Amino acid sequence: MMMRWAEISVDAEPQAGDAVSEALRRAGCDGVYMRDTLQPPQVTGYLPADDRLEARLDGLQVALQTLPSFGIVGAGTALTLRTVEEADWANAWKAYYKPMRVGRHLVVTPPWETPTLYTNDIPIIVDPGMAFGTGSHPTTQLCLAALEDYMEPALRVADIGTGSGILAIAASKLGAGEVVATDNDPLAVKIASENAAVNTVPLQAQEAFPVGSYDLVVANILADVIISMAEDLAALVKPDGVLIASGIIDTRETDVRFAVESEGFAPLETRHSGEWVALVFRRSTV
């Protein structure tokens, strides 16, 4: 007998998509994905329609209601539900994930697709089912393109807030000599390690904040987190090294820029995608 599933959808503006996805995942949802072509955009996931469903939905609503206290706006709290058969959902959500080209040669693809690759293309395989970062979010794409431009052979790289590990995997495939990926969520560390194995790249994934100095550091996290850890990020980057900072909504660009530049960084460039921003800095040699 096939299992029945509850399809749960929550309205989420782009800036809240990752947080809502994480809330669904923590509630136990499988197959979490964002439908950003809808108006308003929605995040959808699937829970078993069993005797634990009501308690899980209650917990999910509580989690969604607390998001504004963390500075996350644009997340709905109302849940839209419908019941689906296992055969329907198991493949339906996968239709939203196709190979995507980012930058000049990076191709992000789910494991069930076989993308067309051209000379010098670099495939990055990421399973979107865990909702830890699939490459579809503008900030991830900004960081991937920046990595492609600033990576040089054998650089030592740190990825702060790695999520799925997509940026760390890209750095490794672009020629980094050593990559350390950190996340304070142990499940993210596990998923990043699994994704690295699928991509057959070495990756040191850990919960602990890295120590030592790095040629390039990428931090695709919230603006407030970048601001709060600006001093720690500065300690990681070697003199003349590069910091790529994103996860920044355009209204917070000035705040992030001030915090980072106050720690001895000079701006190199600013990249935009809609309302999202990636900032690239070089650490002073003085």
Predicted regions and their residues:
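Hydrophobic beta-strand segment of the Class I
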Residues: 216-218
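Active-site capping/gating segments
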Residues: 249-286
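Conserved beta-strand elements of the Class I
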Residues: 124-125, 158
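Conserved helix-to-beta-strand junction in the class I
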Residues: 146, 150, 235-239, 263
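Conserved short alpha-helix immediately C-terminal to the canonical SAM/SAH-binding motif I
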Residues: 187-191, 225, 252
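A short glycine-rich, Lys/Arg-flanked "PGG" loop and its adjoining helix->strand segment in the class I
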Residues: 227-242
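N-terminal auxiliary segments of SAM/dcSAM-dependent transferases
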Residues: 3-10, 14-118
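Conserved SAM/SAH cofactor-binding pocket of Class I
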Residues: 130-213
